[in-house]
């Protein structure tokens, strides 16, 4: 939310009410909702609603289930960025699906590593006690 600036819209799509509540308690987004991430048309409709028909500039998919590629692609505007950061992603489905619906989006693959990522992650935990608390609850 910090990086999106005052005019940026950060949206959190969760898979359950529990996950939505967990994210909402961190207050890291402007809008929150939960739905089935494999429901591509539902996700498209929600993205259209939240962006007044403009769709998202950037979509980050970190869902750990299969068949969520099209929901991310349809929620993204043409020339936008879809960042797939899940081992469940099928890049064949993503590439052929985007072509099949005529979406010209830039698709990036997250591999879990980038220079300095460990320091950034640790700094986020140091800077935000809410995130540190959640991290400890989930992984300690």
What function would you assign to each model-found segment?
Residues 10, 36-38, 56-58, 83-86, ...:
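Glycine-rich loops and low-complexity Gly/Arg-rich segments
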């Amino acid at each position: 939310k910090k990086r999106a600036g005052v005019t940026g819209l950060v949206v959190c799509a969760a898979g359950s009410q529990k996950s939505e509540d967990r994210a909402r308690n961190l207050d890291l987004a402007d809008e929150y909702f939960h739905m089935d991430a494999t429901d591509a048309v539902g996700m498209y409709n929600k993205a259209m609603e939240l962006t007044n028909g403009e769709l998202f500039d950037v979509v980050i998919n970190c869902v750990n289930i299969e068949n969520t590629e099209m929901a991310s692609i349809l929620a993204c505007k043409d020339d936008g960025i879809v960042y797939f950061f899940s081992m469940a992603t099928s890049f064949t489905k993503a590439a052929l699906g985007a072509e099949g619906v005529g979406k010209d989006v830039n698709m990036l693959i997250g591999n879990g590593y980038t220079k300095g990522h460990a320091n950034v992650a640790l700094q986020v935990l140091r800077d935000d006690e809410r995130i540190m608390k959640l991290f400890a609850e989930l992984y300690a």
